[in-house]
From Swiss-Prot:
Heme binds at residues 35, 55, 58-59. Belongs to the cytochrome f family. This is Cytochrome f. PROSITE patterns: CYTF. It comes from Rhodomonas salina. PANTHER family: CYTOCHROME F (PTHR33288:SF10), PTHR33288. Residues 1-34 form the signal peptide. It comes from the Eukaryota. The gene is petA. The 4 large subunits of the cytochrome b6-f complex are cytochrome b6, subunit IV (17 kDa polypeptide, petD), cytochrome f and the Rieske protein, while the 4 small subunits are PetG, PetL, PetM and PetN. The complex functions as a dimer. It is a single-pass membrane protein. It is found in: Plastid, Chloroplast thylakoid membrane.
Length: 318
């Protein structure tokens, strides 16, 4: 009897766990259907062979992004990669339900093989304060030198700090003391295209054909169903979700590619790159010794010149 009770209890708990997992995307759409989850699920590598970061496939507007890293770092040292995502904090974006809300931001940092997130016990108190409330994770198990963050509130995180641990060539034979490229992509606001290829409600809707707008029907959710009679006589239906505002009226003639709504998008995506040098401690010490030798030689040369001038002056007086 007791065994049957335990078995039933285990089955019930398993059913609850499965139900929660299935309902999570519905209860938390902003967390699931947001950058960078789309990219992680759809692309093995976020940077295409052309150099373009795949986030640009959904975030169509171009916006600036900046990255700052040290010019050179030593092996097994922690440094900051600072990503700047500037935008006007006064603007509001169209959310999934059509209302206006604040923008969120996200970023993907692509580092060379061997560079990893710095362990918490290696962070300084200042670094811990800068990264407080920001969850940074590897892109995937096979891409541990690519890091993603977001979506997070943009108002508090226009600057994102990535604490990075530099690799040591002595421990990793694939790492060398050379100059490496660093790539970054960052977005602010929602995308215009879903991974399925469908438009979101944060983009402009236009007429695919030339004709006449014969009917505008408002839906229960607040969107519109537009019926366009093409020049060939065939009716065409366009679904406009809640969010974009119409700029056309019923009975109006429209041309191909003519805007039917305003463009509600206020965000966008940007990418840039920089370089970082993994410095050899022996080379740095050798360079310091070389500079010290040069400076010492210059000092000795000046002293020798002064001594020679004094001897010449003494001989002239004699």
């Amino acid at each position: 009897m007791k065994n049957n009770y335990l078995a039933n209890l285990i089955k019930t708990l398993q059913a609850i766990v499965v139900s929660v997992a299935l309902l999570a995307p519905l209860v938390l759409p902003s967390a699931v259907n947001a950058f960078p989850v789309y990219a992680q699920q759809a692309y093995e590598n976020p940077r295409e062979a052309t150099g373009r970061i795949v986030c640009a496939n959904c975030h169509l507007a171009q916006k600036p992004v900046e990255i700052e890293v040290p010019q050179g770092v030593l092996p097994d040292t922690v440094f900051e990669a600072k990503v700047e995502i500037p935008y006007d904090l006064s603007v509001k974006q169209v959310t999934g339900d059509g209302t206006k809300g604040p923008l969120n931001v996200g970023a993907v940092l692509i580092l060379p093989e061997g560079f990893t997130l710095a362990p918490k016990d290696r962070l300084t108190p200042e670094m811990k304060e800068k990264t407080k409330g920001v969850v940074i994770s590897p892109y995937s198990d096979s891409k541990k030198s690519i890091f993603v963050v977001g979506p997070i509130p943009g108002a508090e995180h226009q600057t994102i700090i990535f604490p990075i641990l530099a690799p040591n060539p002595a421990d990793n034979k694939n790492v060398h003391f050379i100059k490496y490229p660093v790539f970054v992509g960052a977005n602010r606001g929602r995308g215009q295209v879903n991974p399925t290829g469908d438009k979101s409600n944060n983009t402009l809707y236009s007429s695919p054909v030339e004709g006449r707008l014969t009917k505008i029907e408002k839906t229960e959710k607040g969107g519109y169903i537009l019926t366009i009679q093409s020049k060939s006589g065939d009716p065409l239906t366009i679904n406009v979700p809640v969010g974009p505002e119409l700029v056309v009226k019923e009975g109006q003639k429209v041309t191909a590619d003519q805007a039917l709504t305003v463009d509600p998008n206020v965000g966008g995506f940007g990418q840039t790159e920089t370089e970082i040098v993994l410095q050899s401690p022996a080379r740095v010490k050798g360079l310091i010794a070389f500079f010290f030798t040069v400076i010492l030689a210059q000092i000795l040369l000046v002293l020798k010149k002064k001594q020679f001038e004094k001897v010449q002056l003494a001989e002239m007086n004699f």
